[in-house]
């Protein structure tokens, strides 16, 4: 089928109501940018899941980063999208005047800073899903090879698959998943096979152009209509079915899995990545960061993260919570659902 036939099919779909979840902030943005919702039947509802690593990072992690940055002769490197995430003791941005915090553009900046001043402890706020984990692993491999000992990694690195299983277990009304393209470049598509079989739901990997997303929605709908539940790869120009073997090997050498807390979901076994024994000396206090701030009842960030509501259904959306003054983490990041919805609606 060509794209016109796909649009015609989706626009005229009149089967049972369907709820399809994407778990990638770039997909969320692309769906808005290309007006995908206007091209499909109102019976096909597209919702956002836990696709933003910044948004699911717990309060305790922010506080741990702040505490490190306030240590004597210590400096914290972080990507800019972490600066406004609220912690129990304020955000990194709010603590910047009393803490040594630098916005980085690459984890490898830590090596140069550590070499420039061996007496200073350089902390790296490592937040992300499988897409960004190899960069942190390679940086630590390089530091270890060069005998650099004054780098510390504070990790909130997570893997997407356990969160998808949490959704399947706790959100029975999700009918199918638009799987993340960037993450799947690393993991491949076979990681979704077991979930598709166990829960009877389609898992289809999508690219980021309008036609990619529309084709993915079409394949999910067709699978549901024909009683199928399989994983499919519709992003073959970037995603290999078996993933990136070299990247996976690097991750496995440096990191091991353990429990991690996700905002909105709670603790999920095996979803966190922590430094293995031979790299443990580089850990900056990453384990056991489970405490999370209770947001006021009016803030429904947790419900947004798991797709229970759309961002504009939150009573604080645009009313005391916007990208300039975010209250919840979903409004902070460029990949956060609330931030994307706000920028596209205003």
Question: What do these predicted ranges mean?
Answer:
Residues 152, 171-237:
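A conserved active-site cap/scaffold subdomain adjacent to cofactor or substrate pockets
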Residues 1-119, 133, 143-146, 154, ...:
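Metallocofactor- and cofactor-centric catalytic cores in central/energy metabolism, strongly enriched
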Residues 24-27, 129-131, 157-161, 181-185, ...:
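Glycine-rich beta-alpha junction loops
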Residues 33-34, 90, 136-138, 190-191, ...:
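Short amphipathic alpha-helical segments
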Residues 125, 129-191:
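Phosphate/pyrophosphate-binding betaalpha-module
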Residues 19-20, 150-151, 226-236, 262-263, ...:
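Flexible, glycine/charged-enriched surface loops at secondary-structure junctions
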């Amino acid at each position: 089928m060509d794209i016109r036939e796909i649009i015609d099919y989706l626009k005229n779909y009149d089967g049972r109501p369907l709820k399809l979840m994407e778990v990638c902030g770039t997909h969320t943005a692309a769906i808005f940018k290309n007006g995908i919702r206007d091209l499909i039947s109102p019976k096909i509802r597209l919702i956002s899941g836990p696709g933003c690593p910044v948004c699911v990072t717990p309060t305790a992690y922010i506080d741990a980063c702040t505490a490190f940055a306030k240590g004597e002769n210590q400096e914290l490197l972080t990507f800019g999208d972490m600066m406004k995430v609220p912690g129990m003791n304020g955000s990194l941005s709010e603590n910047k005047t009393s803490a040594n915090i630098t916005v980085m553009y690459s984890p490898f900046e830590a090596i140069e800073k550590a070499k420039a001043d061996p007496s200073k402890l350089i902390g790296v706020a490592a937040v992300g899903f499988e897409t960004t984990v190899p960069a942190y692993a390679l940086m630590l491999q390089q530091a270890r090879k060069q005998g650099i000992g004054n780098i510390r990694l504070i990790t909130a690195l997570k893997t997407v698959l356990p969160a998808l299983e949490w959704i399947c277990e706790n959100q029975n009304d999700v009918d199918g998943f638009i799987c993340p393209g960037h993450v799947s470049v690393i993991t491949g598509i076979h990681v979704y096979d077991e979930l598709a079989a166990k829960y009877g739901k389609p898992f289809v990997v999508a690219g980021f152009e309008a036609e990619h997303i529309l084709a993915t929605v079409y394949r999910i709908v067709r699978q549901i209509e024909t009683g199928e539940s399989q994983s499919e790869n519709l992003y073959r120009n970037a995603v290999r079915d078996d993933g990136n073997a070299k990247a996976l090997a690097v991750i496995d050498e440096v990191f091991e899995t353990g429990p991690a807390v996700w905002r909105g979901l709670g603790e999920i076994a095996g979803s966190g990545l922590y430094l293995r024994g031979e790299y443990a000396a580089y850990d900056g206090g990453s384990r056991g960061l489970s405490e999370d701030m209770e947001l006021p009842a009016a803030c429904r960030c947790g419900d947004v993260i798991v797709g229970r509501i759309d961002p504009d259904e939150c009573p604080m959306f645009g009313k005391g919570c916007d990208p300039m003054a975010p209250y919840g983490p979903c409004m902070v990041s460029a990949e956060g659902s609330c931030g994307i919805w706000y920028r596209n609606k205003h």
